[in-house]
């Protein structure tokens, strides 16, 4: 009976209206895949979540908040569930300088990219979504290649807006060929820009999984073929003085007919469940055992990413090559915004 009361109390915390925004539905965003699968409400602590990485993400935040807040289970549950209930608000505010990509990389979302930079439960409304940034065997959307010699695949992506924000534009990045989803965090240093343009609302297709709107953002992107699992990083940026942007990690994998060369494939060096447990704090029979070694390792990854932003070949320094494109795009979007006033 006490468990039912606790679950009801936790669930009641979410019976409020939120300013909803959206998420990738094809390929599906990491956080949306987890929230759609469910299992996060019971039992407390995330034991009902079937997907090992979704469970690790939940437990990572749950135990972090639990250990920093004097063992408040309700607060820890609220924090962890926030990653699920707020799957349409993986967002950050850039202010009027939102076209400055170095500003985005250094100040707006410098780390925890899959969480849109949200890593502190005390900061609302974004909270702590950092569990979504754990390296590991995330379930990917698998795309069959029609030809094993393909270097690029043109795909139509779909973003489901739970609230429409126009004018706006999209950027799509892809992790570079050396990225290892099992051990590497998604950081700006290992991302390459492959798409940057405005996108208009269009009717959703019959096979769409977007239930929140009859209109979606659909746009074609030429995606470089990667021999191993990779991540698309999608930024949906509003054109307004507040500079609200939405950031989604999308796990993907291309399927070869005969398979790529073995030396090109990156495979995990560990059992998936064991590694997922290493990155999450452990909960056994209500007793929480902190694993500070792994937490320090994870934070070291994030801090290194921040330090490397200005110097890495794929960090801000590389964006001078795109400076003219950004300046040109800023002028276009600024004029568009002015004409709509």
Swiss-Prot record:
Residues 1-20 form the signal peptide. Keywords: Disulfide bond, Late protein, Signal. The keyword Signal applies. This protein is a spindle body protein. Homodimer; disulfide-linked. This is Spindolin. It comes from Choristoneura biennis entomopoxvirus (CbEPV). The lineage of its organism: Viruses, Varidnaviria, Bamfordvirae, Nucleocytoviricota, Pokkesviricetes. The gene is SPH.
């Amino acid at each position: 009976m006490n468990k039912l009361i606790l679950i009801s109390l936790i669930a009641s915390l979410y019976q409020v209206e939120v300013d909803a925004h959206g998420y990738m539905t094809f390929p599906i965003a990491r956080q949306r895949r987890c929230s759609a699968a469910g299992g996060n409400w019971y039992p407390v602590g995330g034991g009902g979540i079937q997907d090992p990485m979704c469970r690790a993400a939940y437990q990572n935040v749950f135990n972090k908040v639990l250990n920093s807040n004097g063992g408040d289970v309700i607060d820890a549950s609220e924090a962890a569930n926030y990653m699920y209930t707020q799957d349409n608000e993986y967002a950050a505010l850039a202010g009027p300088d939102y076209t400055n990509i170095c500003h985005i990389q250094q100040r707006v979302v410098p780390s925890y990219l899959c969480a849109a930079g949200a890593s502190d439960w005390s900061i609302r409304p974004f909270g702590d979504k950092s569990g979504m940034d754990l390296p590991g065997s995330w379930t990917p959307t698998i795309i069959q290649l029609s030809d094993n010699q393909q270097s690029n695949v043109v795909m139509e992506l779909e973003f489901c807006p739970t609230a429409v924000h126009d004018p706006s534009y999209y950027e799509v990045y892809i992790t570079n060929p050396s990225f290892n989803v099992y051990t590497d965090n998604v950081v700006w240093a290992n991302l390459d820009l492959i798409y940057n343009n405005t996108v208009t609302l269009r009717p959703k297709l019959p096979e769409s999984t977007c239930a929140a709107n009859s209109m979606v953002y659909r746009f074609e992107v030429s995606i470089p073929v990667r021999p191993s699992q990779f991540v698309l990083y999608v930024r949906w940026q509003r054109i307004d003085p507040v500079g609200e942007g939405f950031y989604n990690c999308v796990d993907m994998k291309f399927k070869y007919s005969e398979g790529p060369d073995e030396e090109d494939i990156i495979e995990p060096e560990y059992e998936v469940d064991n590694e997922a447990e290493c990155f999450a704090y452990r909960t056994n029979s209500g007793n929480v055992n902190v694993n500070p070694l792994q937490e320090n390792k994870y934070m070291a990854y994030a801090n290194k990413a921040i330090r490397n932003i200005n110097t890495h070949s794929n960090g801000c320094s590389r964006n001078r090559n795109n400076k003219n494109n950004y300046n040109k795009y800023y002028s276009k979007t600024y004029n568009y915004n002015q004409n709509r006033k």
